[in-house]
From Swiss-Prot:
Organism superkingdom: Bacteria
Protein name from the UniProt record: Lipoprotein signal peptidase
Lineage: Bacteria, Pseudomonadati, Chlamydiota, Chlamydiia, Chlamydiales
GO cellular component terms given for this protein: plasma membrane
Family under the similarity heading: Belongs to the peptidase A8 family.
Gene source species: Chlamydia trachomatis serovar D (strain ATCC VR-885 / DSM 19411 / UW-3/Cx)
Length: 167
C-alpha cells in the first residue's frame, strides 16, 4: 500500500472501529438494564424534539426493507464494499480529496454494518430522533457515515467537473 493512501486506510479503519465500539457499548449497557427500567439508555428532550439512545435491530436494508433476502443482501453489500475499495485504490491519485473523504465515509459505514451482520446476523441501530409525533427510523453511526459520505459525494460531483471524468 503506497504511503499516500495510508491515512485514508487508517481513517477508514478508525471510523469503522468507532462504529463497532459504539454498538458494543450500547449492547453491553442495554444488558445491564433491569427488566423494570425504561428501554432507552439516554434521552434528551428539547421542546418537541427528542433524541434517544435505544437499541434496536435491523435484519434488512435501509429502513428494514428486504428482510427476506438476507444472503443476497450480504453478497450485494460485500460486492459494493469491494467495488468501492477497488475504485478508491485504483483511482486514488486522480481523485479529488473531497471524493476520497466521501468514499472513505461510505466504505467505513458499509464495513461497520457488514461487521454487524457477520457478528450478530443483523445490524445494531441505536440512535432515535423525533419531532412532535414524527419519528425518524433508528440508525447508527455507520448509517450516518454512509449518509454524510453520499451527500458529500453528490454535492462535490454536482458542483464540480470531476463527475465528467468517471460518468
Amino acid at each position: 500500500m503506497p504511503t499516500r493512501s495510508l491515512p485514508t486506510f487508517l481513517t477508514l479503519l478508525l471510523l469503522a472501529s468507532i462504529d463497532w465500539v459504539s454498538k458494543l457499548v450500547v449492547l453491553l449497557k442495554s444488558c445491564q438494564l433491569s427488566p423494570h427500567s425504561s428501554a432507552f439508555l439516554y434521552s434528551y428532550v428539547w421542546g418537541h424534539f427528542s433524541f434517544l439512545i435505544i437499541p434496536s435491530f435491523n435484519e434488512g436494508a435501509a429502513f428494514g426493507l428486504f428482510t427476506q433476502y438476507k444472503i443476497p443482501l450480504l453478497i450485494f453489500r460485500v460486492c459494493v464494499i469491494l467495488g468501492l475499495a477497488l475504485f478508491l485504490r485504483i483511482k486514488y491519485k486522480s481523485l479529488h480529496r473531497r471524493t476520497r473523504v466521501a468514499l472513505t465515509l461510505i466504505l467505513a459505514g458499509a464495513l461497520g454494518n457488514v461487521g454487524d451482520i457477520l457478528l450478530y446476523g443483523k445490524v445494531v441501530d441505536f440512535l432515535s430522533l423525533s419531532y412532535y409525533s414524527w419519528r425518524f427510523p433508528s440508525f447508527n453511526l455507520a448509517d450516518a457515515f454512509i449518509s454524510i459520505g453520499t451527500l458529500l459525494l453528490i454535492g462535490h460531483l454536482y458542483f464540480t467537473k470531476e463527475s465528467k471524468k468517471y460518468f
